Amino acid sequence: MSNQTVSELKVLTAKSATNYGFDVTDFKMFTHLNPLSIQVNIRHKNPDKKVTIDDCSILSQYIDEAIQGSSILDQPFNLEISSEGIGDFLTEEKDFQTFKGFPVEVSYQDLKKIEQQINGLLLKRTDNELHINQKGKTQRIPVEDVIQVRLATPSG
């Protein structure tokens, strides 16, 4: 991927964030991942306001639409919008819906009640199972065995 493409994506992302009252504090691209991963950290332009999960979700939709509507990127990508002020742990049903497709780290107990950890992309949480995409394969973890789920930084 060319430096020009990365620069154009940074500018487009910053403009989209500014239009909705946010500043981009960090922009990273993980081009070695398939699909490509774009990680954007934001903050409110108004320093008295905190960034919420809903803010991240809404801004993610706007930035995704802007990227899709441009001719800058012609390949699949994952977009992650976050803020330093948001907790890393997913606990509420709304969190699991909002961060579908995001990289997560899951701690759980296996059949022998030994704590294990896996990383992957969050697919969904049902009443009975947590579904994680790990290298293209769906891992299903019983909800009662899950210790914690937290947002993770994409890695290769």
From Swiss-Prot:
> Which biological process terms from the Gene Ontology are attached to this UniProt entry?
ribosomal small subunit assembly; translation
**Gene3D superfamilies from the entry?**
RimP-like superfamily, N-terminal
Q: Does the keyword Cytoplasm apply?
A: yes
* InterPro entries named among the record's database cross-references: Ribosome_maturation_RimP (IPR003728), RimP_C_sf (IPR036847), RimP_N (IPR028989), RimP_N_sf (IPR035956)
- Which compartments does it reside in? Cytoplasm
Q: Does the keyword Ligase apply?
A: no
Tell me the keywords, alphabetical order. Cytoplasm, Ribosome biogenesis
On the tree of life, the source organism's domain of life is Bacteria
Pfam families xref list: RimP_N
Q: Chief localization class? A: cytoplasm
Mind telling me which GO cellular component terms the entry cites? Answer: cytosol
What family name appears in the similarity comment? Belongs to the RimP family.
Q: Function of this protein?
A: Required for maturation of 30S ribosomal subunits.
What is the protein's name according to its record? Answer: Ribosome maturation factor RimP
User: Species lineage, top-down?
Assistant: Bacteria, Bacillati, Cyanobacteriota, Cyanophyceae, Synechococcales
Gene name tied to this protein: rimP
